[in-house]
Amino acid sequence: MCIRDSVPEYFRSMCYINQRIKETGAEVVINFYELLTGLTYALFRPSVPYVCIGHQYLFLHNHFEFPRKSVIQLSMLRFFTRMTSLRASRRLALSFRKMESDRTERISVVPPLLRREATAMQPEQGNYIHGYMVNSGFADSVEAFHALHPEIPVHFFWDKQDADEVTKVDATLSFHQIDDVKFLNRMAGCRAYASTAGFESICEAMYLGKPVLMVPAHIEQDCNAYDARQAGAGIIGESFDLESLLRFAGTYVPNREFIRWVRSCERQIIGELERLADQHSAVTVPTLTNYFPI
């Protein structure tokens, strides 16, 4: 067997990352919560500064409040997050709201990164519930709600294998295969949104002024949901209790400050990169207009 073939795949990947940093003449590396990048910097110690971006870095912030969950699971989550950012010059923590920087952990809190398609949407007040489920088994609770309230239109997206593009149960209940364009269009026109607590979709719902029911599927989403609830995004449930969502929707007030916060995204992140450039004079700050909402 060739020695190269016996080297673990992840180690070869780190060698490749390190080599690409050298070959491209990169002035700064931006890491979006990728473990191998953190390990590459720990092992090979490239001289090029790097910045880590992700909502998970808020879990390392001294003032972040965690839900009452397993201490072991929370510790493992924090450990993994730290491993992705070993020797990082700066950690940019995407957040639902403003927070002070944590100098000890080299954390700067910045607005969420939303895709331009989401920020360009014009929200409308519709009459249907929009949702996304990771596990198609949750369809049972959605169908149970529908049996009691057939007059309320419900559109859920899922990734169920072998299902049709649209599974139409009847005139007011449909399950759709994932499609980014259709998903955002449904989000913009819905009455309320139900989903597992993925950070990005919660942010999109908040930006579009939609009340949210969050059903966390794992420890990271538990933390997302807890933080989002504090920011006024919505309520947390153990199942897709759509009746509770509709009750909450009746009193929900959109967070206008969140919209302003998101719109300051480019300015905030460019500012952080400029501060990094001041420390490393060779770094040229890139224009991010094509990536961040203005």
Residue ranges and their predicted role:
Residues 1-5:
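Conserved small/polar residues in nucleotide/adenosyl-binding loops
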Residues 18-34:
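Short N-terminal targeting/anchoring amphipathic segment
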Residues 28-33, 185-224:
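A donor-sugar binding/catalytic signature common to diverse glycosyltransferases
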Residues 33-36, 95-99, 156-165:
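Short, polar loop motifs at secondary-structure junctions
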Residues 44-109:
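Active-site-proximal region of nucleotide-activated glycan assembly enzymes
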Residues 109, 113-189:
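Donor-nucleotide binding loops and adjacent catalytic segments primarily
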Residues 167-168, 211-255:
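Nucleotide-sugar donor-binding patch of glycosyltransferase catalytic domains
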Residues 247-294:
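C-terminal amphipathic helix plus adjacent low-complexity
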